[in-house]
Amino acid sequence: NLLTFHEKADELIEEEEELRNKHLEYLKEAAKLLTEEGELISNLQGFGNEEYDMDEYVNRMERIIKRNLDIYGDLQQRMQRFKKHMQEEEEAH
């Protein structure tokens, strides 16, 4: 059982590292999406409604929103799974 304990501890450490790396990756992507969103709103404010393509604005915003939801949904699942594994590891002691 000692080997199993060490294997589980190693798996938890690996999962922790993967979680941090994925969080950082998603944070960078979310920053790019936020920049794109800022550009969209700036363009919208800079033009009269007749001159700016609202279809493009709506389509791009929908894509940005969907990607953000995907990012944070995946991150939330990873966090919940990691939290569960931490609790299981604590209970094994």
Predicted regions located by residue number:
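Extended, charged coiled-coil stalks and adjacent low-complexity, Ser/Thr- and Lys/Glu/Arg/Asp-rich tails
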Residues: 1-93
